[in-house]
């Protein structure tokens, strides 16, 4: 039987090392008194706008790397808007959402796959920055 946790932990550590030189704030998966299930690799691109985040996701997709945005703030959902919720009342939720990207994280990723994702993060970040997208 293959245990999933060590595989995910290896991938998370590989991402942490490989993305350390980018202005990405990665969610902490492991600490002295906690461990996550490792089902998402959430990264905040520090200082990035939604425009940059969206362009990053699109360009990563063009490079064959599926990225996403998770955890849309509830006030942005129609049901909550209809109840009178206003995203302006939740600035922290909006800030988290605005520059958050979810990178691939699953047990079928090989070391080469993770290295490719890391390399594309560097390349796409550099390309967008060179174009002046922020």
Which sequence ranges carry the predicted segments?
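PLP-dependent aminotransferase class I/II
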Residues: 1-134
């Amino acid at each position: 039987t293959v245990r999933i946790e060590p595989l995910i932990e290896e991938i998370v550590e590989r991402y942490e090392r490989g993305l350390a030189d980018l202005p990405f704030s990665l969610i902490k998966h492991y600490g002295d008194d906690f461990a996550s299930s490792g089902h998402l690799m959430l990264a905040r691109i520090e200082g990035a706008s939604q425009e940059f985040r969206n362009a990053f996701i699109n360009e990563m997709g063009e490079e064959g790397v599926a990225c996403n945005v998770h955890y849309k703030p509830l006030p942005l959902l129609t049901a909550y808007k209809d109840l009178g919720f206003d995203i302006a009342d939740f600035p922290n939720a909006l800030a988290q959402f605005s520059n958050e990207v979810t990178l691939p994280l699953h047990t079928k990723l090989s070391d080469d796959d993770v290295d490719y994702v890391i390399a594309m993060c560097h390349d796409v970040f550099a390309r967008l920055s060179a174009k002046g997208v922020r």
